[in-house]
Amino acid sequence: GMSEEKRSPGLGVGLMLVCAVLWSTAGLFIKSVPWNSMVLAGWRGLAATLTLWLFMRKMHYRVRIDMRTVLIGLCVSGTSILFLIANRLTTAANAIVLQYTSPVFLVVLSMLIFRRRYRAADYVTVIITVCGIALFFFDQLTPGGMLGNILALIDGVTMGGVYLFTGESDEERRLSGIFLGLAVTTAVGIPFTVAYPPEVTVTSVLAVIAMGVLQL
């Protein structure tokens, strides 16, 4: 209804700030675990999937599968995997900053898909962010850094998609979508363990579990 429309921008910004803090700690965690990106995505996904599953059981939510939850799921798994790969290729700071382009893509996608109208302030934010991204790109002209930047930008798009599709859904569908995304990430990532056996140390295992639980 109207009240939800009114309330969402402020709430969204708050959520993004919380996310910002979590993702920055993620950047540090990722650097501390010397595993292959896909292996890391898979095991972290497993920890997150189990945490969310326990939470959904407690709340008596079912995992619903429909067009919207699948879209959320694809965006969630895209975001997790791209963030990890980008983090390896570019500096953690770059990957995180570029991932914060997601509000820009959120505004653009929702204008295209939901024909949303925005306030002037939102457009200003978009323009400033775009200028910031341009600076980042010209700063990192090394091929690896560049590829990492591009992946981190696509990551911004998928993250914008997560906010876009979850923003329009009720709690059960929102969590179902996130659950599907984490499950996909787990299924895609864990098989890489065979090709790239990780160094299993207490530190790395704890870091992966912490990442899985916190990243929710």
Segments and roles (model prediction):
Residues 85-90, 138-146, 168, 195-202:
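Membrane-interface helix caps and helix-loop-helix hairpins in membrane proteins
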